[in-house]
Amino acid sequence: MAVSARDYWDLTKPKVVALIVFTALVGMFLAIPGMPTWLQVRTGALGFLGIWLAASAAAAINQLLDAKIDAQMARTSWRPLVVGKVRPAQVLAFASVLIVISMTILVVWVNVITAVLTFASLIGYAVIYTVYLKRATSQNIVIGGLAGATPPMLGWAAVTGLPTSADWINASLLVLIIFIWTPPHFWALAIFRRADYAKAAIPMLPVTHGVPHTRKQILVYTVLLAIVTLLPVAVGMSGVFYLGGAVVLNAVFLWYAWRMLDPPDELFSMKMFGYSVVYLMALFAFLMVDHLLLPWVR
C-alpha cells in the first residue's frame, strides 16, 4: 500500500510542531529592535523553515522509537507507523531527509550557531528524552523538557547569531518560561492518561507517585511559572501590554492548578491541559504584540 502525504504529515505531529515554531517566530521578533530589515526577514523565514523541518524530523523519530509504546496507548494507537500505514524504514528515511534539508538551510543561509542549537535540541528530544529519560525517571518531562523549550532561542539565534550576553540572557528567559510551563502542561494530560502510561510501563509522575502528589506538583510549577513570566518585564524586554496579558493568563492558570487539588470530575485535568496550550500561545502572542505594535505603552 502506497504511503499518502497525509501519513507523512501525521508523522510530524503538526499540532505540536505548530506551537513549537510559533514560539520560535516570537523569539525572532523579540530579537530585533523595531521593524526588521529585508535581510532579517529573509534570514528569519529561512530560519523558520529550518527549525520547522528539524522539529518535524524529531517528531517522526520519536514515533519511530516509541512505536511499541504508542501501540499500547489509546491516545497514540492511531499513528501511521502503529497501524501499518508506513514502515520503519520509510519513517527513518523521511526523518533523515528532513534533517539534511534543515541543516543545509540553517548552515548555508542562516548561521552555524542556529544549526548547532537546533541539532542539539533534536537529539535532546528524539534520542535522549525518547530513548532514555522517558523510560528511566518520573522526572522525564522535567529534564527532557529543556529540548522542547529551546525554540525561542533558536528563533532568536536565527536573526541575530546571539552575538552578545544580553541576547543569550533574553533568549534564555523565553526558554525558561516554556521549561517551567512544560511539567504542569504535560502532567495534566498524564493524570487523565495514567492508565495508558502504567500499561506501557512509562514512569510518569502520576504512575510512580500517585495523582494527589502530581496535583501538588502541578500547583508548585504553576506558581513558579507565574513568577517566571514576569521576568521579561523585569529586564525591560516587555512592557505593560504584555504584563497585563500575563497577569490575566496566570490568574486563570493558577485557578486551574488550585482547582486540580480537588477537581470536580475526571475530565478536569484535560480541561487544564487544553487551557495550558491556549495559555502558552496567548502569552507569546502578548510578547510579540507588545514588542511590535504597542511600544508607546511601555
UniProtKB/Swiss-Prot annotation:
Keywords: Cell inner membrane, Cell membrane, Heme biosynthesis, Membrane, Transferase, Transmembrane, Transmembrane helix. Pathway: Porphyrin-containing compound metabolism; heme O biosynthesis; heme O from protoheme: step 1/1. One of its GO terms (molecular function) is protoheme IX farnesyltransferase activity. The chain crosses the membrane at residues 16-36, 45-65, 97-117, 141-161, 172-192, 223-243, 244-264, 277-297. One of its GO terms (biological process) is heme biosynthetic process. Its EC number is 2.5.1.141. The keyword Phosphoprotein does not apply. CDD domains: PT_UbiA_Cox10. Coiled coil: none annotated. It is found in: Cell inner membrane. Its main location: membrane. It is an enzyme of class 2 (transferase). GO terms for cellular component: plasma membrane. Gene3D superfamilies: UbiA prenyltransferase (1.10.357.140). It catalyses: heme b + (2E,6E)-farnesyl diphosphate + H2O = Fe(II)-heme o + diphosphate. It is a multi-pass membrane protein. InterPro entries: Protohaem_IX_farnesylTrfase, UbiA_prenyltransferase, UbiA_prenylTrfase_CS, UbiA_sf. Converts heme B (protoheme IX) to heme O by substitution of the vinyl group on carbon 2 of heme B porphyrin ring with a hydroxyethyl farnesyl side group. HAMAP family: CyoE_CtaB (MF_00154). Belongs to the UbiA prenyltransferase family. Protoheme IX farnesyltransferase subfamily. Carbon 2 of the heme B porphyrin ring is defined according to the Fischer nomenclature. NCBIfam families: cyoE_ctaB (TIGR01473), PRK04375.1-2 (NF003349). This is Protoheme IX farnesyltransferase.
